[in-house]
Curated annotation (Swiss-Prot):
It comes from the Eukaryota. The gene is MPT3. Solcar repeats lie at residues 76-160, 173-257, 274-353. Its main location: mitochondrion. GO terms for biological process: mitochondrial phosphate ion transmembrane transport; response to salt stress. This is Mitochondrial phosphate carrier protein 3, mitochondrial. Keywords: Membrane, Mitochondrion, Mitochondrion inner membrane, Repeat, Transit peptide, Transmembrane, Transmembrane helix, Transport. It holds the Pfam family Mito_carr.
Length: 375
């Protein structure tokens, strides 16, 4: 049984491979053991395997998924989560570029783009099929960078805050751990996303502005300056931080409830296919909540990045408070629900591919230790 104190030891002390320090320790311990054996006139008492292991290395091994070599909460674990985030966010956002394009234009020019169907019709008539994928390069690059930071730092902050809180408080306030970890990760992720988002919106809502990222980026800088790339950072935080807090906390809670009430077997006994299905379902429901919570700020981001010198006050005056909450919302619910479900499905599929467990359905590490200690 694992001691609850083990989870409070910093993650850098977990080891599965020999570091220079552990190698030196092994050499010292081995030399001492050999010297004692040579001085002994008779064979030493037979040691148990456990005692031999404890003499060889006193560092605590981090848990691993059977059959694979990636330790939980090791640098390789965070690298895998980071790469999974790149795949899940970059590819999914690029795929829904046509929906995003119509949504942005409905927010900017509702008199022209009155509905989803008419919006697609207008784009097809004016720009052709190619017009549906205008801005896909900044979308792919921006959301790949955001996904890397979002998922990688979420796993890091979730573990860090769990360690700081300790087993008892982590078990009691795990939702707060999810909220704090996701908010911290999104602050960093949006700094990476913001320049790409600014260019993307300008390219998508002003067809004559630029063809894409290669010519749009220098044109934007020439027009707005480098500071203009981060003009929408505060509204972007206002959109993405509540979105991500809802995305991760609700997903973790929904998945836990699915395994608790809808599936008769524990998660550990479910097939990987079923676990990935749960990830998609939990992600889709979480995405609906995300869209509702973050939609007013999404309207602000689109408005500010579309017009030079525009302010939040201008946006509120032109769109109105009701419009901030409702303009383009049905399309965004469909888009974000599908997007979030696909993101969690892809992210967990990659984790399974590299031998890691899927996300959710279990408590954070210190909380698990506390449960085991009470058993």
């Amino acid at each position: 049984m694992e001691s609850p104190k083990n989870s409070l030891i910093p993650s850098f002390l977990y080891s599965s491979s020999s570091s220079p320090r552990s190698f030196l320790l092994d050499q010292v311990l081995n030399s001492n053991s050999n010297a004692a054996f040579e001085k002994s006139p008779s064979p030493a008492p037979r040691s148990s395997p456990t005692s031999m292991i404890s003499r060889k290395n006193f560092l605590i091994a981090s848990p691993t998924e059977p059959g694979k070599g990636i330790e939980m909460y090791s640098p390789a674990f965070y690298a895998a989560c980071t790469f999974g985030g790149i795949l899940s966010c970059g590819l999914t956002h690029m795929t829904v570029t046509p929906l995003d394009l119509v949504k942005c234009n409905m927010q900017i020019d509702p008199a022209k783009y009155k509905s989803i169907s008419s919006g697609f019709g207008i784009l097809l008539k004016e720009q052709g099929v190619k017009g549906f994928f205008r801005g896909w390069v900044p979308t792919l690059l921006g959301y790949s960078a955001q996904g890397a930071c979002k998922f990688g730092f979420y796993e890091y902050f979730k573990k860090t805050y769990s360690d700081l809180a300790g087993p008892e408080y982590t078990a009691k306030y795990k939702t707060l751990i999810y909220l704090a970890g996701s908010a911290s990760a999104e602050i960093i992720a949006d700094i990476a996303l913001c320049p790409f988002e600014a260019v993307k919106v300008r390219v998508q809502t002003q067809p004559g502005f630029a063809r894409g990222m290669s010519d749009g980026f220098p044109k934007f800088i020439k027009s707005e300056g480098y500071g203009g790339l981060y003009k929408g950072l505060a509204p972007l935080w206002g959109r993405q931080i509540p979105y991500t807090m809802m995305k991760f906390a609700s997903f973790e809670t929904i998945v836990e409830m699915i395994y608790k009430y809808a599936i008769p077997n524990p998660k550990s006994e479910c097939s990987k296919g079923l676990q990935l299905g749960v990830s998609f379902a939990g992600g889709y429901v979480a995405g609906v909540f995300c869209a509702i919570v973050s939609h007013p700020a999404d309207n602000l981001v689109s408005f500010l990045n579309n017009a030079k010198g525009a302010t939040v006050g201008d946006a509120v005056k032109k769109i109105g408070m009701v419009g901030l909450f409702t303009r383009g919302l049905p399309l965004r619910i469909v888009m974000i629900g599908t997007l979030t479900g696909a993101q969690w499905g892809l992210y967990d599929a990659f984790k399974v591919f590299v031998g890691l467990p899927t996300t959710g359905g279990v408590a954070p590490a210190p909380a698990i230790a506390a449960t085991e200690a009470k058993a």
